[in-house]
């Protein structure tokens, strides 16, 4: 089965608390059981330091969001059999090019844009996974 996770955290790339450990642990176990696993996380400035080399996907998209246009690029890498997608959103709001994951006044808006960009890219590349798991309040 093909399972996609959309999450604000995934260890070791972006971790604040237990969510990051749950996502990576669950993903590793699903891969071990023979499933195909994708994990979408925002491209935080600090996330790529923990990843193997990244490659930028040829596909990109743009979408209207809250009165502005958001351009979405995605970088990918493989970590312990898990396909990691880092969603890079460009807009005047500068959603994820910040120093930390949470604690901003616009967190709800930031993560709504991240989920929208992730779903747009999943649709664009015709992944169509039968399971999309949205983790915790930022993505659910």
Regions found by a protein language model. Give the residues of each.
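Structural motif
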Residues: 2, 130-131
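Conserved aromatic-histidine-acidic binding/catalytic patches
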Residues: 11-18, 22, 102-110, 131
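N-terminal subdomain of nucleotide-sugar transferases
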Residues: 1-76
């Amino acid at each position: 089965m093909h399972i996609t996770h959309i999450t604000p955290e995934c260890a070791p790339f972006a971790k604040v608390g237990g969510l990051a450990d749950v996502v990576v642990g669950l993903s590793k176990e699903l891969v071990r059981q023979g499933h195909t696993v994708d994990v979408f996380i925002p491209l935080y400035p600090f996330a790529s330091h923990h990843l193997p080399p990244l490659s930028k996907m040829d596909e990109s998209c743009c979408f209207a969001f809250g009165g502005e246009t958001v351009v979405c690029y995605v970088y990918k890498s493989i970590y312990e059999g898990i396909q990691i997608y880092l969603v890079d959103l460009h807009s005047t709001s500068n959603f994820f090019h910040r120093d930390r994951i949470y604690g901003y006044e616009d967190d709800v808006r930031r993560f709504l844009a991240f989920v929208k960009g992730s779903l747009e890219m999943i649709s664009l590349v015709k992944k169509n996974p039968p399971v999309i798991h949205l983790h915790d309040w930022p993505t659910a």
